């Protein structure tokens, strides 16, 4: 009975792969290859980021025209959704049938 309780108890407390006293993962050749590939990609990204595509003069206001065009598109879409104006004069115009200026 005591042996059964001892064998069916929970395992080692905590998680074996996380924490301060975790079990270290074995370093395989695939892990090394992936790390090297990632570092090479990062070095290439740093290379291209370090060289600007445009000068500061070219960069200043280069998207202003596109941004203005996009804002006009958004504004037109909003106005298309909005119902058109209704005036009281148009709705009550039928009441003016017999109204004339005194002559």
Swiss-Prot record:
GO molecular function, one term: structural constituent of ribosome
Protein name per Swiss-Prot or TrEMBL: Large ribosomal subunit protein mL63
Family, per entry: Belongs to the mitochondrion-specific ribosomal protein mL63 family.
Transmembrane segment boundaries: none
InterPro entries: Ribosomal_mL63 (IPR016576)
GO cellular component, one term: ribonucleoprotein complex
Record's subcellular location: Mitochondrion
Presence of keyword Mitochondrion: yes
One Pfam family in the UniProt entry: MRP-63
Record's keyword annotation contains Mitochondrion: yes
Keywords: Mitochondrion, Ribonucleoprotein, Ribosomal protein
Protein species of origin: Danio rerio
